[in-house]
Amino acid sequence: MNKNKQELLKAIRMGELKIMNPISFIIDEICDCLLMDKYVAATTATNLLLEETLKLALIIFDSQGKTLDDDVEFENMYQTEVEHNIEKDLYVNIEKAFHVGLIDDKEKEKLHRIRKQFRNPFSHGSHNEAVKCAQTLIAIANISDVQNIQYKKVPVKNQPLLYYLAKHEFLKRESLRYFLNVYHYIVSLDQKLQSLYLW
C-alpha cells in the first residue's frame, strides 16, 4: 500500500469537523474502502457523501444558526429545513448552494463536472464520458500464424468487456482524487457554516 495514501487518509479521519460532523461516519467508511483498494465502493460512498454534504449544509444554512436555546423541542428543531431540503436532487442542491452563497461560480461548475463524471455513471449506471471515449490496445493474431501478431487501438464503448475494464481502471486512478475533492468541499462548507454560530 502507498504510505502517502495511508497517511493522508489517516489525517482525514483525524480531522475535526464541527458543523458537518454528522457525516463523519461516511468519511470513515470511504477511507476504509480506499485503504482496502475497493474503488467502486469508495466511489459509490463518495457519491452518497457529496449528496449528504450538500443537503446537510443547506439544512444548517437555512436554519441560520438555530440552537437548543431557541425554545424548540430537540427532535423538531430542524423540521422545516429538513422538509425543504431533504428530497432535492444533487443538481438542485448544487444550484441552491450557489444561489445562497455557500459555493462560488467556479465551485458550482466543478461540482457539476464531478456530478457528471462520477455520480451519474457510478450510481446510476450511465456511461462515463471519460471511459466512453477511451481506447485500448488489443492484440490480433491468426491461430495458423501465431508469429504474426498485430496490435490495434480500439474504442471500448461498444464492447462490454473492454468498457468495464476501462471503467475499473478509471476508478483505480480517480477514486481517491474524487474523494479528496468532495472532502475539500466539506471542510470549506464546515468553515463557512461555523460563522452562523459565532456571536
Language-model features: where?
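Amphipathic, well-ordered alpha-helical segments in soluble domains
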Residues: P22-I26, E52, F118
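Short amphipathic alpha-helical interaction/hinge segments
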Residues: L54-F61, G65, S123-S126, A130
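Amphipathic alpha-helical scaffolding segments
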Residues: N47-E51, K66-L68, L137-I143
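Flexible secondary-structure boundary motifs
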Residues: I59-H112, N142, N158-Q159
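Short, hydrophobic, well-ordered secondary-structure elements
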Residues: I27-C31, L35-I59
